[in-house]
Amino acid sequence: LAGIFLGDTVMFASMNRLGPRRTGLLFATHSVFSVLLGVLFLSERLSAYAMLGSLLVFGGVLLAVAFGRREVDAHVWERNDKLAAGVALGLAAALCQALGTFFAKPAMAAGLEPVTASALRMGVSCGAHYLLWCSGWRLAKSRGRYTPRMLGQTALNGLVALGLGMTLIMLALQHANVATVGILSALSPVLILPMLWVVLKRPPPPLAWIGAVVSCAGTALVVLR
C-alpha cells in the first residue's frame, strides 16, 4: 500500500505538475528517507565510508537530474505554475517509497521469497487501485481516451519497473539493509542519462555526466565499505 499504491500514484500526480525531470529530482530523496528510517527504527549503522558514499550518491543524483536536460529540451509538462503542489507530491512519493522498503525489510529478512513478495505487493496495490477506481472519485477517472500506444507503454512500464525492478529490490533487501538499498536504488536518474542521449540524439550537458561520475564513486564506497 505504501510503496506502490500510494507511492507510485502520488509520483505520477507530481509528474503531471512538474514533469519527469524535476519529479525524478524529488523522488531521489527517498534515499535520505530510507537512511533515516533504517538508522532510527531498525538500528542500522553506516560506516564513515558508507556515509560519505551516501552523500556522494545523493549529491551526484541531484547534479545529474538538475542539469540532465538542456533548456531547449524542457518537457512541455514543466511549463506550468503548479510548483508547490508538485513539490509536495514528489516528496510524499519519495517518503512512501522509503516506507515501502522499510516495511518490506522484516519479511525479507525472515526468508520470504522475492518473487512472492513482489507479487503480493503488486496484488494488494492492484486491488486497492481497483477499489479506488470503483469508488467513482473524479481524480481516479481517466480524462482522455486510451490508445494502443499508451496502453503498451504503460504495460511495459509495469513489466520493467514493477515486475523486474521491485523484485530485484526485494532480493536486495535479503542481503543488505534498508539504508544501503535506498541509496543504491536512487541511482535510476543517473542510469537514464545514456537513454536520453539515444532518444534526444544529443549528449546530456557536462555537469550531468560529472554528477553521474560522482554517484558512481559514491556507489563504490557504499558497496566496498
What residues fall within each predicted segment?
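Hydrophobic residues within alpha-helical transmembrane segments
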Residues: 29-32, 48-55, 88, 92, ...
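Membrane-interface interhelical linkers
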Residues: 1, 8-18, 66-89, 110, ...
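Juxtamembrane boundary at the C-terminal end of a transmembrane helix
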Residues: 171-175, 220-225
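Hydrophobic/small/kink-forming positions within alpha-helical transmembrane segments
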Residues: 1-5, 31-36, 58, 62, ...
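Interfacial helix-capping/hinge residues at the ends of transmembrane alpha-helices
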Residues: 11-12, 23, 31, 38, ...
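Hydrophobic/aromatic residues within transmembrane alpha-helices
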Residues: 14, 40-46, 107, 117, ...
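Juxtamembrane helix-loop-helix junctions in multi-pass membrane proteins
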Residues: 19, 96-125, 180-183
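Loop-to-transmembrane alpha-helix entry segments
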Residues: 27, 34, 38-63, 67-72, ...
